[in-house]
Amino acid sequence: GHQQNPTTGYNIKGDPAGKIDLESLCKAMGIADVRVCDPYDLQKTEETVKAALSFSGPSVVISRRPCALLKYVKHQPAFSVDQTKCVGCKSCMRIGCPAISMKNGKAQVDETLCVGCGVCEQLCGVKAFVHH
């Protein structure tokens, strides 16, 4: 992440460049099962990966989402943790998000690092994560 790749239409310097259609490339290589998912949607991503794993031949899963670290990517509002709801189960820590840490046994969000992706909200069983 954090740099251009052949599917973005820009080179490593950020200048316009040829763009590769990754799905077409995979199909041209003989991959019959090519699936695309948004990695911010955990349920659909899990369903996509399970379907690909159950396919009888080679399968490709393309996770498509602009890198959150690129300057031109627009972010959603940051999340925060309702400390009265957080039970300290650490489910949110499974994603390794740099914005989430534990303090006094409960999750907290560094709003300067949060890109508002909502993955933490999807993982939290007690709905302690809230948008601003």
Segments predicted by a language model, with ranges:
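Glycine/aspartate-rich loop-and-adjacent alpha/beta segment that forms the canonical ThDP
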Residues: 51-102
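Active-site-proximal structural scaffolding
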Residues: 15-19, 30, 38, 54, ...
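Fold-independent oxyanion-binding glycine-rich loops
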Residues: 37-40, 63-66, 83-84, 111-112, ...
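Short, contiguous acidic/charged loop-to-helix segments that flank catalytic cores in large enzymes
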Residues: 10-14, 77, 82-87, 111-115
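Residue-level preference for nonpolar/small residues embedded in alpha-helices
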Residues: 17-21, 44, 78, 106, ...
